[in-house]
Amino acid sequence: MTAEDLDLLKRAEDYILAVELTSGEQFFAEIVMVVDQPPTPDVFLLRVLREPDGAFTASTTTGESILLADIARVAPIPGVDYPAEARP
């Protein structure tokens, strides 16, 4: 993940981003918390699905932790209004 992606991830807590893992898996997620500290920098997130009307709904009731090293990139989702602090 680039420094710009990491910066966006940190600013997007409580917002939904597109996430791509180094394995190639892609999904939408609500970013809960980013912990960019040793020994295991990671992000806590909740996977979400986009409904036909554009709304997002949780795809699970439990969140998950993903190591920052396992994230290839993050991006804002087209058509979603982000507040200024969460924009790239």
Residue ranges and their predicted role:
Residues 1-88:
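Conserved RNA-binding domains used in RNP assembly and mRNA/RNA metabolism
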